[in-house]
Amino acid sequence: MKDEHNQEHDHLSQKEPEFCEKACKEQQYEEKQEAGEKEGEIKEDFELKYKEMHEKYLRVHADFENVKKRLERDKSMALEYAYEKIALDLLPVIDALLGAHKSAAEEDKESALTKGLELTMEKLHEVLARHGIEGIECLEEFDPHFHNAIMQVKSEEKENGKIVQVLQQGYKYKGRVLRPAMVSIAKND
């Protein structure tokens, strides 16, 4: 009986390492599976957070680019406004030079004063043109976008509504009217 018990014990002793080994392998397998699941969860969590951060980055970058463009546009508009304001301030000076030239030319077209005023006016108009400021043409056709009719006169030479005389030169800045030309137009009854 003792032998039987010893044999059974030996038999169990031999099975015990196999059982432990099998139990350890099962436990390791379960731990690996749990670790894999945790790793998968961590990876999913990381990918989700990465995606969120990337989307935030893209939004912030787009906002930054929009602000940058808006600032450039505002800067450009401020510069345009400054040029326009300077041009408006120069118009009375140009008018005075034109008046002086007209008076000097009536007295003596060949005088040094007349020639000097002509050269000054030419240079001034060149500078203004370089910066987008130019005189409004006053041909025969009256255009309310560019001309301001301040009086009507009888004219045998001009048709009704045509420009007879330019009383004050008009100017535009990059196509936009700074000051309309003051003109008289024909009115024939």
Curated annotation (Swiss-Prot):
Pfam families: GrpE
Domain of life, per lineage: Bacteria
GO cellular component, one term: cytosol
Gene3D superfamilies the record matches: 3.90.20.20, Head domain of nucleotide exchange factor GrpE
Entry annotated with the keyword Aminoacyl-tRNA synthetase: no
InterPro entries in alphabetical order: GrpE, GrpE_coiled_coil, GrpE_head
One GO process term, biological-process aspect: protein folding
Subcellular location field: Cytoplasm
PROSITE patterns with a match to the protein in the record: GRPE
N-terminal signal peptide: none
Gene Ontology terms for molecular function: adenyl-nucleotide exchange factor activity; protein homodimerization activity; protein-folding chaperone binding; unfolded protein binding
UniProt key word Chaperone: yes
Self-association and partners: Homodimer.
Family to which this protein belongs: Belongs to the GrpE family.
NCBIfam families with a match to the protein in the record: PRK14140.1, PRK14149.1
Protein name stated in the entry: Protein GrpE
Protein's organism: Helicobacter pylori (strain ATCC 700392 / 26695)
Species lineage: Bacteria, Pseudomonadati, Campylobacterota, Epsilonproteobacteria, Campylobacterales
